[in-house]
C-alpha cells in the first residue's frame, strides 16, 4: 500500500514519531526549538573514551542542511572503553550527555562507551545522539 506523502505546513523544526505496531506516524512542531535554537560555533565529543580524554574535545562536523546537526566518522571516531559527553564551543557552560550507550540524550550524565570505531550523530536542539559501531 502506498501511504502517500505527508505535508510539512511551514519551515521549522518538527518531531517525527512512527509506531511500527499500528503503522501510524505523528508529525508535530517542535515548540522548544525556537526558544533554544542557539547557534554554536563548534560542538565536540570529550571524555575518557575520546582521543583527547577529558582535556580536549574532538570536533564534530556541522551538517550542511541544519546548523543543529553534527557528525563524526573516520579515524577520529575511534573510541575506547570509557565515558563521553558532548559540549559546545570547547567549554563546559553548555554540555550534553546521556545514560545509555549508542543512543539517548538530553541529560547531564556521562555516556557509557565501548571500544569501537563509530559513526556519531548529535543534535544540539534536544541533546539526542546516535553512536553506531562501525568496525573496519
Regions found by a protein language model. Give the residues of each.
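Insoluble glucan recognition modules
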Residues: 1-136
Amino acid at each position: 500500500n502506498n501511504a502517500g506523502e505527508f505535508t510539512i505546513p511551514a519551515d521549522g523544526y518538527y518531531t517525527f514519531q512512527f509506531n511500527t505496531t499500528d503503522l501510524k506516524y505523528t508529525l508535530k512542531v517542535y515548540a522548544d526549538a525556537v526558544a533554544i535554537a542557539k547557534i554554536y560555533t563548534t560542538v565536540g565529543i570529550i571524555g575518557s573514551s575520546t582521543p583527547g580524554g577529558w582535556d580536549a574535545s574532538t570536533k564534530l562536523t556541522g551538517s550542511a542542511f541544519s546548523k543543529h546537526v553534527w557528525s563524526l566518522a573516520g579515524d577520529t571516531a575511534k573510541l575506547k572503553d570509557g565515558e563521553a559527553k558532548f559540549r559546545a564551543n570547547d567549554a563546559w557552560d553548555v554540555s550534553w550527555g546521556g545514560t545509555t550507550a549508542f543512543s539517548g540524550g538530553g541529560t547531564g550524565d556521562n555516556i557509557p562507551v565501548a571500544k569501537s570505531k563509530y559513526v556519531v550523530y548529535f543534535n544540539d536542539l534536544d541533546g539526542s545522539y546516535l553512536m553506531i559501531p562501525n568496525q573496519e
